[in-house]
């Protein structure tokens, strides 16, 4: 039996690691969830994701409720108060229980002398809630995005930035990809129905299913057997443009965690696939995904800027470059991105993308296809990146995705329930 732990203090410490130390919630949360009971896993996740989704609001409220911020060794208390405010604002947890558990969290983080302070701040919020929220809703902080990102979205999408921001602040739907080598989408949907769950097919992507209500993967028919994979619909769209064929040599570059590698092999089971990523941890997940789906690919660790180090002079029929990016299209799925990214990251990422594109182009056969993809919504990483590449690369031709003046296809967050995603299909003359 797992030891009873204070979830509020665990959430506060995790959020502090994200905001103060720049760590990814995707790395921090799973080990923490192993320490709590199954019924508490979901609540711990809700508290972490929820606070990070609404961080700017909670920060704004604390600044109104407290004379000065908590600093130094007491900084965790700042995040514990955030967890308390989030529960009062956004959950169905009875207020008395939310307060009691949050105040008790001070003991778990070895700050019992601050229980009274935490209790006082949260009770003050309860008394002034209507007045504070009215003031908050009249401020720019209501968009729940850092100002640098808000400015970039407003500049890039003067007519659509508000709908993008709104979509980013929602909980994402759960999308699945049916493994066509095992089942047709319709036959798997019938199995889902028999299991008492509902799913809906995507209009454009032939393997995509949206669950009516998100569910744990172990509850999905045939998940362990590889019949289905969790993958957003927009990410599945890459295969529409890549169109892999049996017998081809295909490179999946920046392949971790392996969702697109396995999708290539579902569409073209006899393709020769090389999956490459610079990150060892992400590569381990590529191996895990291949194993679960019973598939084989060559997997290598390598830097996309120096392909000769990991593939020599090899040429490929098709290349999928899922480029490292700001991930500004998947904020609803990873709300910590809002607080991990900085404005200065964008030109640095654009430079890295440019270097990888130039380096890998020489490894594409004449007549071959390269699909450039990102989960960003920022033009510097997307349309402007491809426009510049086309201008400096004489043998590159845009195909099916946009125009030379406005290259690529940009999906915005929430459009057709998918994540924000960009694709450009390039042919080598």
UniProtKB/Swiss-Prot annotation:
It catalyses: cytidine(967) in 16S rRNA + S-adenosyl-L-methionine = 5-methylcytidine(967) in 16S rRNA + S-adenosyl-L-homocysteine + H(+). The keyword RNA-binding applies. It comes from the Bacteria. One of its GO terms (biological process) is rRNA base methylation. PROSITE patterns: NOL1_NOP2_SUN (PS01153), SAM_MT_RSMB_NOP (PS51686). It is found in: Cytoplasm. S-adenosyl-L-methionine binds at residues 254-260, 277, 303, 322. The active site is at residue 375. One of its GO terms (cellular component) is cytosol. InterPro entries: MeTrfase_RsmB-F_NOP2_cat, MeTrfase_RsmB-F_NOP2_dom, NusB-like_sf, NusB_RsmB_TIM44, RCMT, rRNA_ssu_MeTfrase_B, rRNA_ssu_MeTfrase_B_ent, RsmB-like_ferredoxin. Keywords: Cytoplasm, Methyltransferase, RNA-binding, rRNA processing, S-adenosyl-L-methionine, Transferase. Its EC number is 2.1.1.176. One of its GO terms (molecular function) is RNA binding. It holds the Pfam family RsmF-B_ferredox. Belongs to the class I-like SAM-binding methyltransferase superfamily. RsmB/NOP family. Specifically methylates the cytosine at position 967 (m5C967) of 16S rRNA. This is Ribosomal RNA small subunit methyltransferase B. The gene is rsmB.
């Amino acid at each position: 039996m797992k030891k009873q732990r204070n979830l509020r203090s665990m959430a506060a410490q995790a959020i502090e690691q994200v905001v103060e130390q720049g760590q990814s919630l995707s790395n921090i949360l799973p080990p923490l969830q192993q320490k709590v009971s199954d019924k508490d896993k979901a609540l711990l996740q809700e508290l972490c994701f929820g606070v990070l989704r609404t961080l700017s609001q909670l920060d704004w409220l604390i600044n109104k409720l407290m004379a000065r911020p908590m600093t130094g060794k007491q900084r965790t208390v700042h995040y514990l108060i955030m967890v308390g405010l989030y529960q009062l604002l956004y959950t169905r947890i009875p207020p008395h229980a939310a307060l009691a558990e949050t105040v008790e969290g001070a003991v778990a983080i070895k700050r019992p002398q601050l229980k009274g302070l935490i209790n006082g701040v949260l009770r003050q919020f309860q008394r002034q809630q209507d007045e504070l929220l009215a003031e908050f809703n009249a401020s720019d902080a209501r968009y729940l995005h850092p100002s640098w990102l808000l400015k970039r979205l407003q500049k890039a999408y003067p007519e659509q930035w508000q709908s993008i921001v709104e979509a980013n602040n929602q909980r994402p739907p759960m999308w699945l990809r049916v493994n066509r080598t095992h089942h047709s989408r319709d036959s798997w949907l019938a199995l889902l129905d028999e299991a008492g769950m509902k799913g809906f097919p995507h209009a454009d992507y032939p393997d995509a299913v949206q669950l009516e209500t998100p569910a744990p993967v172990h509850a999905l028919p045939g998940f362990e057997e590889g019949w289905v994979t969790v993958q957003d619909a927009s990410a599945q769209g890459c295969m529409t443009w890549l169109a892999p064929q049996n017998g081809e040599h295909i490179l999946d570059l920046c392949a971790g965690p392996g969702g697109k590698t396995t999708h290539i092999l579902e569409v073209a089971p006899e393709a020769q696939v090389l999956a490459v990523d610079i990150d060892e941890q992400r590569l381990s997940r590529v191996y895990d995904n291949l194993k679960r789906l019973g598939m084989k690919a060559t997997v290598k660790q390598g830097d996309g800027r120096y392909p000769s180090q990991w593939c020599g002079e090899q040429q490929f029929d098709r290349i999928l470059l899922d480029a490292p990016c700001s991930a500004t299209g998947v904020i609803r799925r990873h709300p910590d991105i809002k607080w991990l990214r900085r404005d200065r990251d964008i030109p640095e990422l654009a430079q890295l993308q440019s270097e990888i594109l130039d380096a890998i182009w020489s490894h594409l056969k004449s007549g071959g296809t390269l699909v450039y993809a990102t989960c960003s919504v920022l033009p510097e990483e997307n349309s402007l990146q491809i426009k510049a590449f086309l201008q400096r690369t004489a043998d590159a031709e845009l195909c099916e995705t946009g125009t030379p003046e406005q290259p690529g296809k940009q999906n915005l967050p929430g459009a057709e329930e998918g994540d924000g995603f960009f694709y450009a299909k390039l042919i080598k003359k």
